[in-house]
Each structure stands twice: as structure tokens, then as C-alpha cells.
Amino acid sequence: MAAVILPSTAAPSSLFPASQQKGHTQGGELVNELLTSWLRGLVTFEDVAVEFTQEEWALLDPAQRTLYRDVMLENCRNLASLGCRVNKPSLISQLEQDKKVVTEERGILPSTCPDLETLLKAKWLTPKKNVFRKEQSKGVKTERSHRGVKLNECNQCFKVFSTKSNLTQHKRIHTGEKPYDCSQCGKSFSSRSYLTIHKRIHNGEKPYECNHCGKAFSDPSSLRLHLRIHTGEKPYECNQCFHVFRTSCNLKSHKRIHTGENHHECNQCGKAFSTRSSLTGHNSIHTGEKPYECHDCGKTFRKSSYLTQHVRTHTGEKPYECNECGKSFSSSFSLTVHKRIHTGEKPYECSDCGKAFNNLSAVKKHLRTHTGEKPYECNHCGKSFTSNSYLSVHKRIHNRWI
């Protein structure tokens, strides 16, 4: 933390109005002798220290910090000239070294720096015992150099942090340390705040509520992501195809389409996936597991997202609205497909005939006209169809006779 010492001999000329100095030439030598005698006996380097808080120091520009360096060094010389015993703090030695390499920062005098001058006047005659004060913010000491440079740097990835506690938490990414355990399920976390958020899964607490739709969340980051549904904000853009996404995670997963990167392989069928969550969802095809159940109708689903979308068939909720025609949809995917009607985009092309479609299911259905595949079979008469919708229409024939 930075500290400013006001020069004893320079204070009247630099920080007080010139009008107060006129008419004081007589007896000047006597006053100087008295001041010198008094200062020699009473004033030490620490006694006249004026400290900047962390926030005040951050407001100073390089020229103002240069002024501080000059004032500090001048003060040390002034005390020495008065015959006072001066034990150089380590900061003074650092400042003398810095002065040799940062002379290009000079150029602002006290008279041309009114904000800093006002600050110094306000702090004048406020004795401090500790030149170096380690400001505490919420019980955590913040380390800074005298020029405001952050000292909390990770020695593995060189990322810099404003507090030692943030650096300590960050280092656990490299070490894998997770010292905070959940007493209910045993899951471990790298920080206490993550554990606090996790515990809300068990107690059902959701203190963060959306002011648009009333939906509640257990942590503020989930609420921020949710709000982008309402605002339409998609700040993450793919630099290859310019598709935009609401989250960095979605963008990262999308980029693997371009790179062909598939790290996660199914050990049963060998199919590879770009994300672990996609592999987990795929594995349930083999196991038949459907752990997500609808409380209204009892229907089960492989993925929580499928259940969320299904529940909207009961509630009638359609939170995704087209900003061109006003039509609403129960899922963001349905809205994305719908928007292609307006844009005319048809990104899915048949490899046999070149015909293009605006959604994947349409091109899959079309491909069956080439392959002759008819996977949808009527359980009454055994007739097969290329699509589920054709089968549904056909079943009405049988329903008439029931």
C-alpha cells in the first residue's frame, strides 16, 4: 500500500496559498531555526506519513505516481538535512531504483495536479505509524507493489489475480485439490462458494429469480445465462461459420464440428462424441435408462432437457418467440428451425440428389425415398411407412372400425 510523506520544508510553498507567505520575510531565519530545532527532536519518517488506500492509489495516473515518488524521496532528503536520523524503509530504496528507469514518466508538478494536491491537503497533519499498510478487504490481504502492479501471479500459467485468496483458489485447477466436501453426497469442490451453491441442490433453495418469467435459480450465473433467452443475447461467435451462442461452453462444443474432434467414445458401439454430456445421453440408448420422469403423466426421458421441453406440453409455456412474426415455441431448437423459414436458410443437403432442407429430420425423412427404408410399422396390419406422421395418418383407418 502506498504512502505519501509531505516534505517539511516544501509544504508551505507547494500546498498552501501564496498569500499566506507574503509579509513573512522578517524574522524568517529565526523561524527556520526554531522549526529545525523542533523537527530535529520530534519528527520522524513515520510520524508525518500520509497513506493512500488501495482505491485511492488505483485512481492515480502514472504522472501522479511519479509525483508521489519525487515527494517521497525529497522528504527523505529533507529530514536528513535537518539532522534527523532516517532509517531508509525498503520502499525508499525501491523508489530510488525506479527513478532511474522511469524518468520518461515525469512532467507533472503539484501546481498542475489539483486532484492529487487536494487529496494531500486533506490528509496533511494526519500522523501514521505504519508507512506500509496492508489494507484488508473482507479479511483477505491484498498485495500490491508501490506502483499498483498486481503481485498475485500463478507460477504455472502466469495468470494474475487481485487477491491472494483468488490465486489460491485458482491454483487448485492445476493441483486438482478439492478441500470442500458436501456432507450429504460427498461431492468435493475447490472453493467454499461452489460448495454453498451445490448445497442448494439438496435443500432446494433458489434465491435468484428471473424478473421476466419468475423462474428461480440456485446461483447468479445460471440466472445470467437464462436472461439471455429473454434478451436474445448470444455473445459467443464462431470465427469459422459465424454462428452465435449464448454460452462459451456451447461455442466450444460447436467448434468441434469444424475440427472433427471427438474425444468421448462409446465403449459399446464405438461412436464418438465431442462432449461428455452427449456421450452420457447416448449411453442411455444402450442401457435403456430414462431417469427423468414427468410428475404430471409419468412419462420418462433420457435427458433432463427432454423432460423440460415435455413439461411445457402440460403448462403450455412457449418462452421462445420469433422476433419477425411473433410465433412462440416451447424450445429454442424449434425457434431456430422456424427462423429458417424467414431467412430461407437450408443447411442440410441430400448427398444423393442435392436437394436442401432447413432441418435435419426433414433430410433424414427424404433420404428414405432413396434407400426405401420404412422404419415405422403399423401394429394392426403390418404396413410400413417412411415417417411417423404417415403412420399416424394411416392408423386413423383402423380407429374408425374400433
UniProtKB/Swiss-Prot annotation:
Q: Which UniProt keywords apply?
A: DNA-binding, Metal-binding, Nucleus, Repeat, Transcription, Transcription regulation, Zinc, Zinc-finger
Localization: Nucleus
Its BP terms in the Gene Ontology are: regulation of transcription by RNA polymerase II
Main subcellular location of this protein, as a coarse class: nucleus
The record's listing under InterPro entries reads: KRAB, KRAB_dom_sf, Znf_C2H2_sf, Znf_C2H2_type
Every KRAB domain range: 43-114
The record lists the membrane-crossing segments as none
Please give the Pfam families that the UniProt record associates with this protein: KRAB (PF01352), zf-C2H2 (PF00096), zf-C2H2_6 (PF13912), zf-H2C2_2 (PF13465)
GO cellular component terms attached to this protein's record: nucleus
- Quote the CDD domains the UniProt record gives: KRAB_A-box (cd07765)
ZnF locations on chain (C2H2-type): 152-174, 180-202, 208-230, 236-258, 264-286, 292-314, 320-342, 348-370, 376-398
Q: Describe the function of this protein.
A: May be involved in transcriptional regulation.
Q: Which family does it belong to?
A: Belongs to the krueppel C2H2-type zinc-finger protein family.
Supply the name of the protein: Zinc finger protein 558
Q: What is the lineage of its organism?
A: Eukaryota, Metazoa, Chordata, Craniata, Vertebrata
